[in-house]
Amino acid sequence: MSNFSPVSVLVASLLVAAPAAAKEPTAKIEGGIIEGIIESGLRIFRGIPYAAPPVGNLRWRDPQPVKPWSGTRLAKSFAASCQQDEGKPFGPYTKSFVTSGERSEDCLYLNIWAPEREKVKKPVYLFIHGGGFQSGGADMPAYDGAGLARKDAVVVTINYRLGSFGFFAHPDLSRESPLGVSGNYGILDAIEALRWVRANIAKFGGDPDKVTVAGQSAGSFIVNALLVSPLAKGLFQRAVLESGPELGLPMQALTAREASGTASLKRAGVTDIAGLRDISAADFVKKAASGFPLPIVDGKIIPKNPEDPATPLASEGPIIIGYNRDEATILQGQSIATFKKEVETRYAAIADRILAIYPHATDAEAANSIARLGRDRRVAGMLLWAERRTSKNAPVFAYSFEHVFPGIDPVQNGAFHTAEVPYILGALHFSDATFVGADQKISDEMQERWLAFMRTGNPGKARSKPKWRAASLDPASIWRIAPADAEPLLDAEKLQMFRDFAAKGGKLGLL
């Protein structure tokens, strides 16, 4: 007589037939072995350390090597974002555009999305987040890299030190640094992340000789700095600058920032850098941090102003640059009552020409002209930057993102600052907005062109029409992600006006 019941036989057969659970992916990298997850055909690793925690005695030091670990380190969750104030949704910036996890000085981590199959090396896309050098993090849902990775690429996102932890200078810090400078720790973090990628990305199926470094807003400026930094030479082959400060970001010299650091030391009530390193991050921010620290021209990491056409490129290669139509709705505001004052203050050298071209007889006209003036200024700055940076080995391709984000007031916010990022990365589903087929079509087309650029250096090799050609001083060379009835970009008269303004030292970028 059989000892097996019909039920037990059925259960046993199901157990035999059931496929084995997918084995979690592992990789042996600098420091040791890490374990990630498998999700929808991708290997995903989150919270990978690319440098030692910059805490204690390592606060305000160049990135240091990771301390090796034993066993297998889990890399399944995002690490903390770098030290910053708590982010809260505002305006069009819903929770998908805000870092919501922990914040800590221990933050030098990166994340990787890679196709499960790695028979052929994939192009690599390393994305550097924005946030005015004060906020942001790689854990933001809008920066999820899975969508682009599914198109056969390896996507990397990184954290870098922010605010006074990333851009603090002091004479004693400069003296103790092997480079002899201080104040650009956030830039050094990005360089270290690129170095890590070059050394390790093949373990994830990525091609270290096809690395595109991309950044948005503050991240775009970092990419601009990387282009001229000798320390980043050979670490990437292509670059993308989204909503960057081309011809626009003011930069201080090292000596000026060191003086600011000396004042911070006094405010903290300590006598030396060791004392400043001993106080907590919260106390430092409360007592000693000041102003709006930005990258500086230090003569070593950033040898000269990246926006100066005389500054040579340390890394030559194809570049994509672009702006969103309505950047100013968030960053500039509606100065209706002060239109003339704005023009006469910011554009003194060409104020009469601007006032003659842009209508401002009524509040409504002035409001429209403020928005239009900001758009024209940025387009002109982008084209002039492209003219200065284009070379035989480094063609520049320009775009204008003019698609209105779903559920957003087209007049008040429109194609706002940062709106393009989830379209490029394929992270639309993380937003609170309701996207339709047209949005997915735009995302697919942008990804197709970006992937062609990542693979070949030429986004014009994508199948999409119209053909995207290299930028020139002709506004028609700009690829526009815009509705068919979109108004024309700036004309020749306006372009010449802004060119004259830039020649006299005027700033045309985002800030």
Where are these regions (language model features)?
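Bacterial N-terminal signal peptides
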Residues: P6-A17
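Non-catalytic accessory segments of hydrolases
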Residues: A20-N184, F435-M446, M454-R463, A484-D485, ...
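Mobile gating loops/cap/lid regions near enzyme active sites that modulate substrate access
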Residues: Q83-E86, A380-L511
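Substrate-access "cap/lid" subdomains that shape
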Residues: K95-S96, R195, A199, K233, ...
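Alpha/beta-hydrolase active-site loop
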Residues: C107, L179-A202, A256-A259
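Alpha/beta-hydrolase fold nucleophile elbow
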Residues: P123, F204-Q216
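Active-site loop->helix "elbow" adjoining a glycine-rich segment at hydrolase catalytic centers
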Residues: G130, Y185-D189, S217-S220
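Short glycine-enriched nucleophile-adjacent loop
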Residues: S220-A232
